Amino acid sequence: MTDYLLLFVGTILVNNFVLVKFLGLCPFMGVSKKLETAMGMGLATTFVMTLASICAWLIDTWILIPLNLIYLRTLAFILVIAVVVQFTEMVVRKTSPVLYRLLGIFLPLITTNCAVLGVALLNINLGHNFLQSALYGFSAAVGFSLVMVLFTAIRERLAVADVPAPFRGNAIALITAGLMSLAFMGFSGLVKL
């Protein structure tokens, strides 16, 4: 049980996909201007990452390894992610048309979000079992969502702050992301390896 708790906390804080592994930076920078959009993107990404991790583990364990088709792993995972994203897009369109319009192009771009593919590939490379894969996908997504919401809150405050002209816009956003990354590095002392 403590292994699962360590995996959960470690993936969210210590090995955060955005601030430590630098995966998923496109939606991190692109959707982080309004809190509602960031929360919606975080929820959609959480759903996709968790479901894609589970499906990727199942396909790898039951199809690719038994048939000795491991060389098709990346292609198979990309196809799985595309199917899961299309399913998510249909669900969001039916349940929340406003969120669907707010997310715009970023919802289909979850397909190309390298964090989603990274979670699926890392699950296999780390030798996770089914529960660990599901938990790892969920924790990575929670970490992604947490960082995105925090970053969005900071960006909203910076939008009304008196920032010097050369630092306005993306410049201060990148500086803020770097400072957040440094802050999250402090969590690495929580886990002794």
UniProtKB/Swiss-Prot annotation:
The chain crosses the membrane at residues 5-25, 39-59, 63-83, 102-122, 134-154, 171-191. It is found in: Cell inner membrane. Its main location: membrane. InterPro entries: Ion_transpt_RnfA/RsxA (IPR011293), NqrDE/RnfAE (IPR003667), NqrDE/RnfAE_oxidrdctase (IPR050133). It is a multi-pass membrane protein. It comes from the Bacteria. Its EC number is 7.-.-.-. It is an enzyme of class 7 (translocase). GO terms for cellular component: plasma membrane. Pfam families: Rnf-Nqr. One of its GO terms (biological process) is electron transport chain. Keywords: Cell inner membrane, Cell membrane, Electron transport, Membrane, Translocase, Transmembrane, Transmembrane helix, Transport. NCBIfam families: PRK05151.1 (NF003481), rnfA (TIGR01943). PANTHER family: INTEGRAL MEMBRANE PROTEIN OF SOXR-REDUCING COMPLEX, ION-TRANSLOCATING OXIDOREDUCTASE COMPLEX SUBUNIT A. Belongs to the NqrDE/RnfAE family. Part of a membrane-bound complex that couples electron transfer with translocation of ions across the membrane. Required to maintain the reduced state of SoxR. The complex is composed of six subunits: RsxA, RsxB, RsxC, RsxD, RsxE and RsxG. This is Ion-translocating oxidoreductase complex subunit A. It comes from Shigella boydii serotype 4 (strain Sb227). The gene is rsxA.
